[in-house]
Amino acid sequence: MENSYEETIDKRRVHLRPDTLRDPAPASLHLLPCEVPVNRPTPVGRFFTPAIRMGRDGLEASFRGRSLRGEEVVVPPGFVGYVVTEEKAEVLMGKQDDHERQEQELLEPPEALERDCDRFMGATASFSSFTVWGLESIPGPDAKLRGALSWPSLAAAIHAQVPED
C-alpha cells in the first residue's frame, strides 16, 4: 500500500507552455561559484555587469572583490538552452487564447489540475552558450555539467543504426 507522500510524488507534473519557446530574448548567462539566496525576480543586470577580460589562461573577472576565472561553454549542436520561470496556474489560464489552449491540449491532454501538484513553466530567455566561473581558478571538469552537455551525443550514438557486417 502506498503512503500519501508517494501518491503525491506520483501526481506531480510540470507543464511547459510551448508558445514561450517560439521567440524568447537571447540572454547572457553566468554560472557563479556562489549561492545568492533569492528566489524572486531581481534586476540582476543593474547589479551584475561583468567586466570580463581575457587573461593568459582564459576569462577573468571579479565579484565582490574576489577573483573569478572562467570559460565559455557552448550548448551542444542542434540544441538551445532556455531560462524558464514558474508561472501561477491562474495567470497561465488567463494568458492563453482559444488557439493556444487547443494547441496545448493536442500536446498534453487536459487532466484535472491539482493545486499543489501541477507546476507551470514558461521560457523567458534563450542561450547558445554560457560562462562557467571558478573562484580564483578555472573551473575543473564538473561531472554534472559535463555529463548533462555530453548526454545528447551519447544518446544519439546509443540509438544510431548499427551497420550489419
Swiss-Prot record:
Is the keyword Acetylation assigned to this protein? yes
Residue numbers bearing the N-acetylmethionine modification: 1
Keyword Nucleus set for record: yes
* Localization in the cell: Nucleus
| Gene3D superfamilies given in the database record | 2.40.128.680
Any one Gene Ontology biological process term?
RNA catabolic process
A Pfam family it matches: RNase_H2_suC
Task: Write out the GO cellular component annotations.
Answer: nucleus; ribonuclease H2 complex
Keywords on record: Acetylation, Nucleus
Q: Which family does it belong to?
A: Belongs to the RNase H2 subunit C family.
Q: How does it assemble?
A: The RNase H2 complex is a heterotrimer composed of the catalytic subunit RNASEH2A and the non-catalytic subunits RNASEH2B and RNASEH2C.
Q: Which PANTHER family match?
A: RIBONUCLEASE H2 SUBUNIT C (PTHR47063:SF1)
Functional description taken from the UniProt entry:
Non catalytic subunit of RNase H2, an endonuclease that specifically degrades the RNA of RNA:DNA hybrids. Participates in DNA replication, possibly by mediating the removal of lagging-strand Okazaki fragment RNA primers during DNA replication. Mediates the excision of single ribonucleotides from DNA:RNA duplexes.
Q: What is this protein called?
A: Ribonuclease H2 subunit C
Q: Organism source for this protein?
A: Bos taurus (Bovine)
